[in-house]
């Protein structure tokens, strides 16, 4: 038998997982600072739920992992955390609104594999249900900037409004049944360019005349400000989209983050579920060209799940932990899981007690040499593990209630009283 991972999956060894855990903690801390509550949903779901018409459209349906249980029920692994969240709200009508939740968990997509993108990956999501105002979007965008500032990553956020985009297509007489196809093509304009968009819409069965109209419209829109779209397109959807975008922009200015955002009139986020604001997050340095976070407003999913066709205003944002890890691993030295490594020299029993005492009286992470290695080999291990401090404890140290403290970065040693050790670390 060949021992190997499934294509698109990866093992993360301890030195890698340290950084991934740091990212997860940063997400949790930031989310909770914004008043979000934790939630956990099943990885395994009914296929009917995950393939629901508001659940992402045909593109995402091709990437769903499906299976059957022993009762012949059609099941699916979740491809995001949004649909399971909407399910929870729909199943629990007594949840107090507004409800702000976060969830960090694995999702699965049988899609293309590229840098920072796998088929099993972790998403870190925040969603707010019960707020109609685009103030919710502004807060989520502000939260994103705070998170990436914590992680020392500089980002920009591109944003748009689906009402604006749908209204533009309506104004140039794109048939309703072709709107989704055109939006999927326009969403790729930064990757494939205007000629690529023309080719893509033609391949989707759109006439040459209509393709020319689409491309000419794109070119004319690129120089427009948000306010200009009302005059350029006499359409009520465009007007609604412009109003919401202008309100959002006012909040972004008030929060001091507008300069790090970019209005992109053809950003669509692909998925058919979005009803208003959409946004994507990109690294400023371009070291990873795909987005490292995204989201938007989806007001119709929960009502559709509940079957009452009521609007449940909902907006969310999602961060890809794996792609953030890829970005950080390119520039950050992997730190150790331990702050202090204790090496006993014939004093194993006493060192066991000292390690326990330090764990219970300080916040230090303590690792004890358990394998009985000689001093040189034990120091070499601590060096390779990037452990900053080593305590060397022999019989003399036990008798004098001291320890030999070695600073691994400086290579210096000093004998200090055990009782005041924390003052030296």
Swiss-Prot record:
Reactions the enzyme catalyzes: tRNA(His) + L-histidine + ATP = L-histidyl-tRNA(His) + AMP + diphosphate + H(+)
SUPFAM superfamilies: Class II aaRS ABD-related, Class II aaRS and biotin synthetases
GO CC terms in record: cytoplasm
One BP annotation, GO: histidyl-tRNA aminoacylation
Cited CDD domains: HisRS-like_core, HisRS_anticodon
EC number: 6.1.1.21
Main subcellular location of this protein, as a coarse class: cytoplasm
Location(s), subcellular: Cytoplasm
UniProt keywords, alphabetically: Aminoacyl-tRNA synthetase, ATP-binding, Cytoplasm, Ligase, Nucleotide-binding, Protein biosynthesis
GO-annotated molecular function: ATP binding; catalytic activity, acting on a protein; histidine-tRNA ligase activity; transferase activity
Pfam family, one: HGTP_anticodon
Quaternary data: Homodimer.
Family: Belongs to the class-II aminoacyl-tRNA synthetase family.
Protein name: Histidine--tRNA ligase 1
Organism encoding this protein: Bacillus anthracis
